[in-house]
A protein has these predicted regions:
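Core RecA-like ATPase module of SF1/SF2 helicases and allied nucleic-acid translocases
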Residues: 2-236
Length: 237
């Protein structure tokens, strides 16, 4: 469950990594809601070109636009800098810097520098909604999303046309804040499509009545995530 994953994540952060801050440099995260970004524009000051690349993560195709720039000096080495235009539910990210923690609309946000290891370590500066980190739901609940939407919409009520108001909401940095959870421990559902060398598996509380075909399917999915070693945690003898 998400609740149990939260317990393991906090235990790993506090007792193994010695981290007490809510979010800090080096934290491993997992994106829990798709996020679309505007396509990048090449810098006019550099001799650059844009080309597209795709990556398939957990069955979802993520679009990354790579900006290839040439250093101004003749014969300089080309630098390829991936720029993500779509961040998928399930993508991994590593925190490089956290700043400007603030509260708006009853939610807490932070500006975070993130590195995405699945995309050649592309780096992005993003606004992250901190409330999603420890929620017991897979991401913000429908009620929370609706609350945020209504509060943001109020800021644009002076715009007469509804279509224009909605466009502003869709572009708003707080409404579009990236939703992430810690990625040290994740649910079996979230792990679908991925594999790791070593897996520590905790099935949680179980009774004989829970031994259904759905449980067998869950068990198969969980066991096949490991490519080398599978460790059973808190498993009944």
């Amino acid at each position: 469950s998400n609740k149990r994953a939260n317990v393991f994540n906090q235990g790993i952060r506090n007792m193994v990594l010695g981290r007490e801050e809510e979010l800090t440099t080096g934290d491993m995260l997992m994106v829990v809601k798709n996020k679309y970004k505007n396509s990048p524009t090449p810098s006019p000051s550099l001799n650059g070109s844009l080309n597209n690349a795709t990556n398939n993560v957990n069955g979802l195709t993520t679009q990354a636009t790579r900006q290839v720039t040439q250093l101004p000096s003749g014969g300089g080495k080309e630098i390829e800098k991936p720029i993500l235009t779509f961040i998928a539910n399930g993508d991994r990210a590593v925190v490089r810097r956290v700043r400007n923690v603030r509260e708006f609309y009853g939610f807490r946000f932070a500006d975070v520098s993130l590195e995405f290891p699945d995309y050649n370590n592309a780096e992005e500066e993003m606004t992250v909604i901190l409330d999603a980190l420890m929620t017991e739901a897979p991401a913000l609940t429908q009620e929370q999303n609706e609350q945020l939407f209504q509060h943001v919409l109020e800021d644009y009520e002076d715009i007469p046309l509804k279509a224009d108001r909605m466009k502003k909401v869709r572009e708003d940095e707080y409404y579009n804040a990236l939703q992430v959870k810690f990625g040290y421990a994740i649910t079996c559902h979230k792990a679908q499509g991925g594999q790791w060398a070593h897996i520590y598996l905790d099935q949680g509380y179980m009774t004989d009545e829970m031994l259904t075909p759905d449980y067998i399917h869950w068990l198969y999915t969980a066991f096949t995530r490991a490519t080398e070693h599978l460790y059973l945690v808190n498993w009944p003898k």
